[in-house]
Amino acid sequence: MNFGATFWGPMISFALFVWFTMKFVWPPIQQALADRQKQIADGLAAGERGKEELDKAQAEVEAMLRDAREQASQIINQANKRQAEMIEEARAEARSEADRILASAREEIDQEIQRAREDLRKQVSTIAVQASSQILKREVDAKAHKDLIDELATQI
C-alpha cells in the first residue's frame, strides 16, 4: 500500500472540506448563532425593561390610589364640615325664628293685657259712677252706703 497517496489524498480532501466549510458553511452558522444570541439577549433585556415598567406602573397605580383615597377623604371631610355648618345655620335660623315668634307673642300678650286693663278701668269707672249716682239718690246712711259698696265689690 502506498502510504503517500493514501495519506495525502484523504488529508487533502479533508483540508478542502474544512476550507469549504469554513468559507461557506461556518459563517452562516456563526451568523445564525450570533443572531440567536442577540435575540435572546434582546428578549432578556426586554423582559427586564418590561419588569421595570411593570414595577413603575404598579408604583404609579399605588400613588394614584393613595391620591384618590386622600381626595376622597378630603371630600368626605369637606362634606361633613359643610353638613355641620348647614345644621348650625338651620339651628341658628330656627332659634331666631323662635325668638321672633316669642317676641311677637309677648307683644300680643302685652297688648291684650293693656286692653284688658283699659276695659277694666272703663268698667270700674262706670261702676263707680253708677255707685256714686245711686248713693246720691238714696239717703246718706252708713249701713246703706256699706251695703251698696259691698254689692259693687261683688260685681267687680
UniProtKB/Swiss-Prot annotation:
Membrane topology: Single-pass membrane protein
Keyword entries, A-Z: ATP synthesis, Cell inner membrane, Cell membrane, CF(0), Hydrogen ion transport, Ion transport, Membrane, Transmembrane, Transmembrane helix, Transport
Main location: membrane
GO molecular function: proton-transporting ATP synthase activity, rotational mechanism; proton-transporting ATPase activity, rotational mechanism
Coiled coil: none
A GO term from the CC aspect: plasma membrane
InterPro entries membership: ATP_synth_B-like_membr_sf, ATP_synth_b/b'su_bac/chlpt, ATP_synth_F0_bsu_bac, ATP_synthase_B_chain
Subunit details: F-type ATPases have 2 components, F(1) - the catalytic core - and F(0) - the membrane proton channel. F(1) has five subunits: alpha(3), beta(3), gamma(1), delta(1), epsilon(1). F(0) has three main subunits: a(1), b(2) and c(10-14). The alpha and beta chains form an alternating ring which encloses part of the gamma chain. F(1) is attached to F(0) by a central stalk formed by the gamma and epsilon chains, while a peripheral stalk is formed by the delta and b chains.
Protein name from the UniProt record: ATP synthase subunit b
Biological source species: Halorhodospira halophila (strain DSM 244 / SL1) (Ectothiorhodospira halophila (strain DSM 244 / SL1))
